[in-house]
């Protein structure tokens, strides 16, 4: 690790932050060209409520959002949160990468920080107009918390615990990033022949303190949202625990692999296999050096476990939940796994370092393409849904108000033609582009209905509606509209338009 900084290194750091920030701007370009709202955004732009962040166990997110708007009702100030979040994440990524002191020269020094920015699972977090800032802030603070501070042991633990408590009150998934970043720092300390066990012990103690404080204070007193409570329960001990754990592993593995379908899986398989070989080479090389055999054995055991920690940190503690949220946004620690493989390969194979640097550009560029495709898909889908709602409103206006009290959907609209190819090429986008008009899904519909001034309530779809024979009030290749006992039923089972 670097003990001092020259004026040249500070200038270099500032440039790296600027260039990394520019990469973030390029990546989010589709969000600038069109006004994109995502999921919860539709609800907040209409009612301005911010209290849900508190009941979700994220009081710091609430505080930051109301402070930014100088009001307890949160109005839309996008793209300011996204810009601020990208700047913070760029700065934290460069500072963290700098502390790794990898033997990179010139513009290749930019590579490590890009792993934290170009992360396909981060795309979903960036889509939230209201949450993007605090989600990226949580990631940034987790990286900073993993650094080995040059203080006494007590201050080190307290400072790290304080940062991690802020992480948990901002966005809980930041804990996974902390675990992954600690794995990378541990590996770098070991390569530098520095003591790793004091660092491991202090970071474990700090993480435990933060988790206990969060559980005792925040969860016990603030978390009341049914959704959060339902998805935060640990797997109960018993014969079914292993089955549930394996199901979680399968679900998260499928989510990760959906970002790298078919031959694209080589973009992660090759770096991983090379890192495994590199780690073995470094272990053999270290075992031949003079020193305490006992110390080398314990250090070697820790290093062997690091790749498994880096992989397990991707879903993190979600693996231990009985009903976890299986979503791309909880897998943002993917960045740490990718950076871990890169660090091992750069340090284990100095003879081919230039080739590794150059070839690393390929998976990073792939992630850029995937993220831009995700943003374009969501933007196009939002435009299509808005146009569809306008058509539905026009059809509803032809029905006398006294004849219709509710609305129901059968199935859901077919995908817009301009997103089908992206969904086919990148299966992960299916989990990012979440449809808002679905059968018996009142929450998703309600947030759109509020914005579009549609007063009809969405009711559950009855089996009788699907088999009803009636006269259609409107019919085309998108939907068929009919009335069923004062309920306007939109039947989307018409198939795609040709």
Predicted regions and their residues:
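Transmembrane alpha-helices and membrane-interface helical segments
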Residues: 94-95, 144-148, 181-189, 275-279, ...
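Long, well-ordered mid-to-C-terminal structural blocks that present hydrophobic/aromatic surfaces
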Residues: 289-386
């Amino acid at each position: 690790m670097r003990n001092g900084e020259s004026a040249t290194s500070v200038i270099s750091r500032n440039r790296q932050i600027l260039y990394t920030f520019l990469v973030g701007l390029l990546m989010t370009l589709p969000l600038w060209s069109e006004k994109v709202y995502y999921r919860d955004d539709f609800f907040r732009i209409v009612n301005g409520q911010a209290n849900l962040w508190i009941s979700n166990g994220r009081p710091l997110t609430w505080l930051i959002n109301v402070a930014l708007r100088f009001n307890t009702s949160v109005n839309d100030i996008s793209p300011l949160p996204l810009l601020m979040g990208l700047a913070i994440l760029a700065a934290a990524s460069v500072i963290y990468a700098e502390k790794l002191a990898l033997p990179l020269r010139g513009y290749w020094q930019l590579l490590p920080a890009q792993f934290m920015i170009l992360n396909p699972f981060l795309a979903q977090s960036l889509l939230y107009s209201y949450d993007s800032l605090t989600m990226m802030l949580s990631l940034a603070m987790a990286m900073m918390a993993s650094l080995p501070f040059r203080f006494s042991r007590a201050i080190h633990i307290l400072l790290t615990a304080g940062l991690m408590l802020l992480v948990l009150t901002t966005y809980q998934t930041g804990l996974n990033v902390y675990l992954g970043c600690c794995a990378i720092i541990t590996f770098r300390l070991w390569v530098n022949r520095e003591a790793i066990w004091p660092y491991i012990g202090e970071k474990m103690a700090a993480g435990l303190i933060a988790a206990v404080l969060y559980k005792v204070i925040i969860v016990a007193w603030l978390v009341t949202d049914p959704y959060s409570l339902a998805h935060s329960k640990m797997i109960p001990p018993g014969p079914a625990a292993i089955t549930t754990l394996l199901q979680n592993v399968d679900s998260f593995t499928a989510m990760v692999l959906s970002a790298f379908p078919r031959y694209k899986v080589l973009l992660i398989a090759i770096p991983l296999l090379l890192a495994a070989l590199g780690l073995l080479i470094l272990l053999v090389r270290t075992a031949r050096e003079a020193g305490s055999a006992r110390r080398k054995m314990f250090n070697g055991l820790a290093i062997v476990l690091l790749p498994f920690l880096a992989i397990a940190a991707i879903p993190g503690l979600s693996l231990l939940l009985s009903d976890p949220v299986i979503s791309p946004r909880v897998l943002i620690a993917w960045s740490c796994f990718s950076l871990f493989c890169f660090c091992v390969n750069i340090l284990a194979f100095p003879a081919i370092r230039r080739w590794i640097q150059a070839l690393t550009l390929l998976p990073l560029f792939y992630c850029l393409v995937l993220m831009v495709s995700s943003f374009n898909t969501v933007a196009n889908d939002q435009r299509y849904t808005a146009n569809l709602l306008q058509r539905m409103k026009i059809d509803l206006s032809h029905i006398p108000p006294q004849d219709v009290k509710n609305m129901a959907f059968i199935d859901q609209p077919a995908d817009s033609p301009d997103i089908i190819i992206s969904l086919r090429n990148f299966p992960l986008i299916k989990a990012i582009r979440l449809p808002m008009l679905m059968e018996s899904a009142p929450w998703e519909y309600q947030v759109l209905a509020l914005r579009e001034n549609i007063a009809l309530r969405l009711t559950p779809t009855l089996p009788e509606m699907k088999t009803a024979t009636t006269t259609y009030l409107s019919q085309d290749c998108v939907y068929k509209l009919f009335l069923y006992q004062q309920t306007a039923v939109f039947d989307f089972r018409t198939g795609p338009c040709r």
